[in-house]
Amino acid sequence: MCIRDSPDTREIHDADLVCLAMGFVGPDATSLVKQLEIELDPRGNVARDNNWMTNVDGLFVAGDAGRGQSLIVWAIAEGRSCAAYVDSWLQGGSQLPSPVTPNLQQLR
């Protein structure tokens, strides 16, 4: 996916939450990543801390955007864990399951 500005097709939508599913191509460092000044790791993935948060306060990342190309099961597990940290960040605590950590590596 590549997002490009097109003056004739611009739309603005109010939203409480925006989720991007990036698939296998990784983050496009020329668009939203650049606009929000999101830091990337040495592999070109969105850098995140141990709580799934990027360098932008309140912006969390899970799945391929943070891990790099991987299996859907990793994206699902990371999404669940990330949701628990988002819940905790918003509510001050969470009872949601958190099956994996941001730096957990698959066995090879």
What does each model-found stretch correspond to?
Residues 20-23, 27, 81-91, 95:
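Non-catalytic alpha-helical coupling and interface elements of nucleotide-dependent molecular machines
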Residues 65-90:
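A conserved FAD-binding loop/helix module that cradles the flavin
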Residues 4-69:
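FAD-site-proximal beta/loop scaffold in flavoenzymes
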Residues 45-49, 87-90, 101-104:
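Short, surface-exposed, polar/charged, turn-prone segments marking secondary-structure boundaries
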Residues 8, 91-108:
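Mid-to-C-terminal Rossmann-like scaffold of FAD/NAD(P)H-dependent oxidoreductases
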Residues 35-39, 52, 82, 99-106:
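Solvent-exposed, non-transmembrane amphipathic alpha-helical segments
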